From Swiss-Prot:
Disulfide bonds: none annotated. It holds the Pfam family SprT-like. This is Protein SprT. The active site is at E70. GO terms for molecular function: zinc ion binding. Binds 1 zinc ion. One of its GO terms (cellular component) is cytoplasm.
Length: 165
């Protein structure tokens, strides 16, 4: 997987170097990005992070558009400095003029939502209201934190039910 992506990063840099007649330091490339973002450029660290799941599901467009998009951020930063807008004129110039690509801000890849886990807690109100807790909040309860019902002021108690959505 990384070979094609690294080759595309290198190709984008060579195009920029040919156009601007100067060399640019190569970034570190990481595949440790999750969630909805396809890629992120860390300007001061000269680092590119890519989402491996979105790459696998959208390989052709990802290599063409997303890699160029993120490389353009680093090139624009190195050419014009830190005070430019992320998707401003300078970045758009690189996307259109060098890579011949539309300067799209966001991808349109289908992103699968991660399964969520909720732990049901209940109070002693007559209605027996359920309170779904996140795993983080459930862990805090296990460590001694208490949460209270706003109506009856009783401590919320874990019912033993776990919901997976």
């Amino acid at each position: 997987m990384p070979e094609h992506l690294n080759a595309r990063v290198e190709a984008c840099y060579r195009q920029a170097e040919h156009f601007f007649q100067r060399s640019f330091p190569r970034p570190t490339v990481s595949f440790r990005l999750r969630g909805q973002k396809a890629g992120v450029a860390h300007l001061d660290e000269n680092l590119l992070r890519f989402n491996p799941q979105l790459y696998r599901e959208n390989r052709e467009h990802f290599l063409e558009q997303t890699v160029a998009h993120e490389v353009a951020h680093l090139i624009a930063h190195q050419l014009f400095g830190p005070r430019i807008r992320p998707h401003g004129e300078e970045w758009q110039l690189i996307m259109r003029g060098i890579y011949g690509l539309p300067p799209d801000r966001c991808h349109t890849y289908a992103v699968k939502r991660r399964a969520t886990t909720r732990y049901l807690y209940r109070c002693h109100c007559p209605e027996h209201n359920d309170f779904p807790f996140s795993p983080q909040r459930h862990t805090l309860v296990a460590k001694g934190r208490r949460y209270y019902c706003r109506r009856c002021k009783a401590t919320l108690v874990f019912t033993g039910e776990v919901l997976r959505e």
